[in-house]
Amino acid sequence: MVTGHGTGHHGQSPVRVPLSSGAPLVEATFASRPSQFLVEAQMGGRMVRAHLADRGRLTDLLTPGARLLLASREEIGRKTAFQVVAVYQDGDLVSLDTQLPNRLVAAALSLGALPQFARYSRVQREVQLGPHRIDFRLSEGLDTCLLEVKSVTRLVDGIAVFPDAPTERGGRHLELLINAARNGQRAAVVFIIQRSRGCAFAPDVTVDPAFSRSLREARSVGVEIYAYRCPVDPSGITLGQEVPVFASFAAVPFELRQH
């Protein structure tokens, strides 16, 4: 279950999108996570509360004392004045913005930087399919492709793994792609590794066995699976190198793992 198509830059300027839509960022120190979507952090000698969009467990990343990047969110009606944007782990900046991969892929599609999808001139986002939505529908005349994008932040021995918590929603998205492929429609999923490290990708069967099974089934019926390692810095995320995709962590060659 290995795929490879290259980054498709061909000398072009790198595809980049800003963190948090370009909002000013401030540094803080992680203190606690009282609930799934709430983080408490020390900033300038005071405790602040920040919204966290990532549904994952993030136990490897959100450790006491971890350096965070927060964006100020002063909109009326918000319960928190800040948004968690990213966290440093061993010097590697990891984006925790789950919508950033979609913005990055949208930019890459518009610039033709993903050659496997370059033939489609029309790009629709957040397309309703029955009770569910798919991230992108690409089309060129009657030729269409359904494309789902997933955010990856966790590493195990240098291998990017997904999910970080059981994801029924992710499983439903795979079912949409599986059904499309069975009906003769092109379908693909792109895993965006939101950090500069991660030399390969694999589903984490220990976290969500059902998702891992669905991903194997998707591959078997023709759903295309890609993964890109996308470096993050305080100014943005860059579409980086495509990395190999494996059916499971156990299938990753030992020499690719970092101990």
Swiss-Prot record:
Return the CDD domains for the record. Answer: SfsA-like_bacterial (cd22359)
> Per its UniProt record, what InterPro entries does this chain match?
SfsA, SfsA_C, SfsA_N
- Please list which residues make up the signal peptide: none
Q: What terms describe the molecular function in GO for this protein?
A: DNA binding
A Pfam family that this protein carries is SfsA_N
Q: PANTHER family recorded for this chain?
A: SUGAR FERMENTATION STIMULATION PROTEIN A
Q: What is this protein called?
A: Sugar fermentation stimulation protein homolog
